[in-house]
Curated annotation (Swiss-Prot):
Localization annotation: Cytoplasm
Family: Belongs to the DTD family.
Secretion signal span: none
GO cellular component entries: cytoplasm
Domain notes: A Gly-cisPro motif from one monomer fits into the active site of the other monomer to allow specific chiral rejection of L-amino acids.
EC number assigned by the record: 3.1.1.96
Motif (Gly-cisPro motif, important for rejection of L-amino acids): 137-138
Task of the protein: An aminoacyl-tRNA editing enzyme that deacylates mischarged D-aminoacyl-tRNAs. Also deacylates mischarged glycyl-tRNA(Ala), protecting cells against glycine mischarging by AlaRS. Acts via tRNA-based rather than protein-based catalysis; rejects L-amino acids rather than detecting D-amino acids in the active site. By recycling D-aminoacyl-tRNA to D-amino acids and free tRNA molecules, this enzyme counteracts the toxicity associated with the formation of D-aminoacyl-tRNA entities in vivo and helps enforce protein L-homochirality.
Taxonomic path: Bacteria, Pseudomonadati, Thermodesulfobacteriota, Desulfuromonadia, Desulfuromonadales
GO biological process: D-amino acid catabolic process
Record protein name field: D-aminoacyl-tRNA deacylase
Keyword Hydrolase in annotation: yes
Record Pfam families: Tyr_Deacylase
Length: 149
């Protein structure tokens, strides 16, 4: 399971020109589920997302988590994070999990965050979405439950 975390001052996601999820300060999360991922990957990544210290403290050091600041999260599924671009000019998606598995683990990840008391807005699974965000920094991190990077 892979995630792109972006520290934002605000973000929202639209489907068919209708806003379906919006947040204030916090994290924008693009989440991709790969074949072989399971509930343990969702739990591990949710814990890391909630606890990663990417917000500045009074001294300007990244020493506070989204939990610490009472921030919000906007989680959007993105199967293209499982793309293999090593050969040719067209990405391959054979590593992406099947839609039913991916949706289940996407929802599990979101539920894990909500169980921690975090406010989580979402996109719509398998929909064509437009994501709008204001990067803060910019500060962006790549997470992988298999620790590839």
């Amino acid at each position: 399971m892979r995630a792109v975390l972006q520290r934002v001052t605000q973000a929202h996601v639209s489907v068919d020109e209708e806003i379906v999820g919006a947040i204030g300060p916090g994290l924008m999360v693009l989440l991709g589920v790969e074949q072989g991922d399971g509930p343990q990957d969702a739990a591990q990544l949710a814990k890391k997302t909630a606890e990663l210290r990417v917000f500045e403290d009074a001294e300007g050091k990244m020493n506070r988590s989204v939990e610490d600041i009472g921030g919000q999260l906007l989680v959007v599924s993105q199967f293209t994070l499982a793309a293999d671009c090593r050969k040719g000019r067209r990405p391959g998606f054979s590593r992406a999990a099947a839609a039913d598995t991916a949706n289940s683990l996407y929802l599990d990840y979101i539920e894990q965050l909500r169980q921690r008391g975090l406010t989580v807005a979402t996109g719509r699974f398998q929909a064509m979405m437009q994501v709008h965000l204001v990067n803060d920094g910019p500060v962006t991190f790549l997470l992988d439950s298999h620790k590839v990077f």
